[in-house]
Amino acid sequence: MANKLRNYTINFGPQHPAAHGVLRMILELDGEQIVRADPHIGLLHRGTEKLAETKTYLQALPYMDRLDYVSMMVNEQAYCLAVEKLAGIDVPIRAQYIRVMFAEVTRILNHLMGIGSHAFDIGAMTAILYAFRDREELMDLYEAVSGARMHAAYFRPGGVYRDLPDFMPKYESSKFRNAKVLKQLNESREGTMLDFIDAFCERFPKNIDTLETLLTDNRIWKQRTVGIGVVSPERAMQKGFTGVMLRGSGVEWDVRKTQPYEVYDKMDFDIPVGVNGDCYDRYLCRMEEMRQSVRIIKQCSEWLRVNPGPVITTNHKFAPPKRTEMKTGMEDLIHHFKLFTEGMHVPEGETYTAVEHPKGEFGVYIISDGANKPYRLKIRAPGFAHLQGMDEMAKGHMLADVVAIIGTQDIVFGEVDR
């Protein structure tokens, strides 16, 4: 009886350091060439959609931060926009500028993590160290406005939790920092938050150039990314790819331009688009997107400096009154009590609201039955569609290229598994 040749099957993850969380993939190999890549998901499923249906609209907000835990505030933004659309809430213009500014800060945070970890997985260690240096400063912005460095819960239906602070947290002296280092670290933290943001926007483009020096013309980086994971424009659209995964294939689609929300229609920025649809082009798109985000942040900062005003709606059925008013007015106290015990009542209806998330189109679909909780909440996670393309993108490549493809998809399992 003749022996039958069989392909070799291996498990990739979920413990693998390049699996970006808890991805388990069953790879079928012919030698070292991939015949089939089968992603198994669900290991980080926490029932977010169902949990949100048991909470009031305000209580459900912090769950959004924990979906894509690298792009926290953009998740919040999509949810808040959906609730505002259903309830017909008018958001003050200053709050819209603050939201857009922090959405772009979040985009830079995401791309630094994406590029840094992608390079690290492939074998270039320096990039992630540079990326985390800049991420540290941006996370200080999160901390200054919300008190948290990751799960901010800063956006609210109707605006934002509070206005921008007049100061930035400073480094304190320790046995690891001498007086000279401490002075350098705190130099840009002497003024307001907007001063800190402007100083960051001045020096960050040079830091992007440094990252590019490490990778863009690096021979090994190009060998590992050029021609790997190619997706044609037609196939990208058929697969439901969005964000950099779609733009890297040459399709100019960005929700901020095609269906503008908040104040994006007042912003001057460009959409970087790839040509070849491979890992290298997607990397270049992310690099350029960070530069465009800096442009948007500068425009927001400029506007916020000269336009004071309210940062949350004055309709107390949806947002709490100021604490000073609450301590003197009985009606304000009642509004506060009702809002945090019973929650806001959103009129009957349904809506799908999408934002341009750093990873693609992040959508929130809400059905309201007029109660204080969503009747149904559905989340459209961009990474879910991208991961489905894994088999097609990896087929015919070598085992080592799987790591490059996972990195270019920029997968985070909080949103994929929900």
UniProtKB/Swiss-Prot annotation:
Its main location: membrane. Pfam families: Complex1_49kDa. Its EC number is 7.1.1.-. SUPFAM superfamilies: HydB/Nqo4-like. InterPro entries: NADH_Q_OxRdtase_suD (IPR001135), NADH_UbQ_OxRdtase_49kDa_CS (IPR014029), NDH1_su_D/H (IPR022885), NiFe-Hase_large (IPR029014). It is an enzyme of class 7 (translocase). GO terms for molecular function: NAD binding; NADH:ubiquinone reductase (non-electrogenic) activity; quinone binding. Keywords: Cell inner membrane, Cell membrane, Membrane, NAD, Quinone, Translocase, Transport, Ubiquinone. It catalyses: a quinone + NADH + 5 H(+)(in) = a quinol + NAD(+) + 4 H(+)(out). GO terms for cellular component: plasma membrane. It is a peripheral membrane protein. The keyword rRNA-binding does not apply. Belongs to the complex I 49 kDa subunit family. NDH-1 shuttles electrons from NADH, via FMN and iron-sulfur (Fe-S) centers, to quinones in the respiratory chain. The immediate electron acceptor for the enzyme in this species is believed to be ubiquinone. Couples the redox reaction to proton translocation (for every two electrons transferred, four hydrogen ions are translocated across the cytoplasmic membrane), and thus conserves the redox energy in a proton gradient. NDH-1 is composed of 14 different subunits. Subunits NuoB, C, D, E, F, and G constitute the peripheral sector of the complex. This is NADH-quinone oxidoreductase subunit D.
